[in-house]
Amino acid sequence: DQKALDKPHWSGWGLDADNTHFQPAAQAGLAPADLGNLEFKWALGFPTGASVSTQAAVLGGRIFIGGPAGGIYALDAKTGCAYWKFETEGEVRGAIQAYKRDDGKLMLIAGDRKAAVYGIDADSGKQLWKDKPEAHPWAMNTGSAAFQGKRM
């Protein structure tokens, strides 16, 4: 449901251009006094058992995370159940960024270790576009997209 994805709650490594990693309690839905009452709800294991090299994006009730063997997963934040999985050419690196398109829908931007950069519809998981900015056979993405207005 696109309405559930309307407002990014966390996108990118540091949440904002200053990389503050700060989110006010009202936006996060969690205050310091709540921390002692948190309970474990679910965990996600990857078949390779490898560590994850990406920062997840949290949008509405979904978590978008890249897998160590490739792929981007859209998970229900409350249950951990998958909405969809998008296949990538390689391991997803850097942060998954959210960008609001001109039509009002959210697009995820992510890069992989094989130097591909993807634009993915956040609701359906369908590929909107793909580019390889560097054609060198050893090229790889290890950073994250940044936005200035309509430029990435």
Q: Where are the model-predicted features located?
A:
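Asp/Glu-centered strand-loop micro-motifs enriched in Gly/Pro and often flanked by an aromatic residue
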Residues: 24-59, 63-64
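A general structural signal for stabilizing positions within well-ordered secondary structure
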Residues: 29-32, 74, 86, 119
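Short loop/turn segments that connect beta-strands within beta-propeller blades
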Residues: 76-79, 121-124
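A structural motif specific to WD40 beta-propellers
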Residues: 39-41, 81-84, 126-130
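Repeat-blade elements of multi-bladed beta-propeller folds
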Residues: 7-17, 49-73, 90-117, 138-152
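Blade/loop signatures of beta-propeller domains
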Residues: 1-40
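Surface loop/turn motifs at the tips and blade-to-blade linkers of beta-strand repeat domains
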Residues: 44-48, 86-88, 132-136
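Short intrinsically disordered, low-complexity coil segments enriched in acidic
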Residues: 1-6, 78-80, 151
